[in-house]
Each structure stands twice: as C-alpha cells, then as structure tokens.
C-alpha cells in the first residue's frame, strides 16, 4: 500500500515541545483518510521537497515565509495552506499578527487559510479580502490534542512518575518572551527587518513592540524577586517553573542553582507536568486552555497591568498580582478550590475556539482532499540526499552536544553558560537532538491510538512518514 500514489501532506515542525504532538494527531487523522504524511523539522521537509522528482501534495505551514520561499515550495507542491499558530487563544491583537505574518504579495499563493474560531474568522475575512473564500473556520488540532490527552491523563506513566518524585506542586508556565536584554534587541531587529519602516504606522508599531518587550523584561525581573522570596516559604507546595521553549533560557539557567524549594525544569513535554500539578499559574499562553480542559485550577499572574493580555486565557483564570495572592492560590489548589471549572465559559469559548461534531483535524483533512492535489508515489531518497541529511544532522548534533556538555560542566562548577549568539541557543531549544520515529510512537501511545493500522517510518534524519497500511 505504501508504494501507490497518494496525497502527500508535508508537516514541518518549528518547535518540538508544543507543536509536535498536535501535529501527530493531525497526521493520524489524515493517514486514516488514506493521506500519506511527512512530519519533521522544516529543514528536513524542505530538503525532501526540493529534491523530489514529482510535483504534488500539500505543504502545511504556520506563516511567516517570504514570497520567494513560498514560490519555491509551490513549484514542487500542488497546494500551500496555512494555520497560523501564532494567532492563538492568547493573542489579544490577531489583526496585527495576521497582517505581520502574511505579506500581501503572498495572499494569492495561499490555497486555504485555517482559523481557530469565529472571532478570528471574521477578522481574517477583512484582512485577507482577496482570498476570503479560501478562509476556513476549522478550529485547532492543538485543541483536538488537548481534549484527547486530557481524557487519558490518568493513565500516564510520566505523570505518575512526576507525582511520585515531586508530590504536590504548582506549575508556573512562563511566557514572558523577553527574559534578557539581548532577547529584546534580537526581537527589535527581527521586527525592524520585517516591517516597512518608511510608513509612519509601522514606526509607531515598532515603538509599541519595543516598549512592550522592555516592560515584559522588567516584569520578568520582578517575578524573579518574588520567586526568591517564595523559595524561603515552607507553607506552600513546591513551585515548578517551565520556561517557554522560545525564551532565552540562560537567565533561567543562572537562577536554577540559587533555589532550594523552587524547581526550574526544561526537559520533556509540558503535558505530563500540567496533568501532575495541583494547579497552574501562567502568563496568558494557550497552555491555559489545556489546563481548562484538564479541569486544573489556574491563575493569570500579572505584575504590570500594562502587560495584561486581555484574551481567552485571562478570562478563564483567577487574576493574581502579589506574593500574598500566589500563596493563597497555591493553598486553594491543595484544597481543590477551582472557581473556573470546565464548561463555565462555553459562550466565551465558542467565540474564540471553534468546536463542532467534527474535530479541527477532520475539517482540515476534508478540506485538503477537496483541494484535489496531485497524488504522488512515496518519496525514496537517493544516496546523495541521505548523505547530505546525515552530514547536516551530524553538524547540528555536534553543536547541540557541545552546547549541553559545556553547559553541564559549567553548572557543575557553579557557573552558567553564556552564548555568543542567542539564535544558536534558540535552535537547540526548538528541536533538541531531532525528531524520531520513537517520538511519533510515544504520542500514539499517549493518545491510545492503535498502531496496527498505521505505518510509521524514518525517512531521513528528523523526517518521519505516517500512513495507513
């Protein structure tokens, strides 16, 4: 069956920690509809696409590409579709995010643009007026994954192991974005290169972004002072901090050694930590929605009112802004007090997140089939492609291992690692050590999917194929 022509769906992953498992859910949904799926790092997916002999299939991305990259992809793929995960439930300004991440000269290249809910659907139709017939109210595969994993979290071995090791704890999910001045400078550089600064509106927007990022850094520093005080408290459960994958982790690394009760943990997926916790404190990221589906008590921490994101995560959470309120929330979690239980906000949810009898993944897969992309045979890499992939992987892993070895040695000596290039650190954090067949199988186990009907194969380094037998 895997040697016949099928629709090929290409799913590039930018960040493994929060993108990978939901994309596997989408991949399995597609495979069940007889679509062959390739999931991997963006570099590996693109290497395959640019080297395949045929032209066909669907490239599924999250936005942010330039016109030259998109045209290059469309020469080798029948369709280019977008579900921009940056326009998530925690985004209080989806208008700006949509316009910033999709340049006007790219609009006509988009065959389908999938959106999270009714609010973003109406906004997208106004912003992308030329292609409004191609805008699909789909929902989000990440929500599909939240729902499925929340139902099965009681059986998770990882969750049980975490609870056994750490007991009762409160999980803080960091989403400051700006945890160092060099991160603020890098963000400024990225926006200044993307925005047309000859326009007054964009100059004003860049100033607003810079001001917001500096406030975020200031708030992060305030939070660190609070953590240092909370670390001395014995009356509350342990607080475990999970830094965001795209934050600068080096300030967190520096702090890690100075705490005794508070833990800063980078390893593994977020889900088992969330499900093992007694409650969640967050900064407005979409993980708040996952906590909501898991019926976990949650609180939105704000130490600067100007930095509050008045989006869905804020509306479904208790609002806290001091050590006293953090302590009270933590103790309430131990007593199972949760004023924001699931289904209390169904109307608010339905505005932001589209839920129907069909999952978001089903809606997207059905739309992909309607596009009628050219079917292709399975990809067979040549020796040269395998060699190039192996060499690139060797260089990447060498840099990753070097990074971690130096960091571990310095940690042992009571010091912390300072990188000369924050973008290099970011690469290690996004997809550390790569994407493997075992990663896919682990997600299938987590979700309780039967593996008997699915073929999972490693194609190249950081590139896996998934299809129906």
Residue ranges of model-derived segments:
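Hydrophobic/aromatic beta-strand patches that form the interior of the parallel beta-sheet core
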Residues: 38, 60, 81, 112-114, ...
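Conserved catalytic-core segment of nucleotide-activated headgroup transferases in glycan assembly
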Residues: 151-254
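Catalytic binding pocket for nucleotide-activated donors in carbohydrate/polymer assembly enzymes
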Residues: 253-259, 286-356
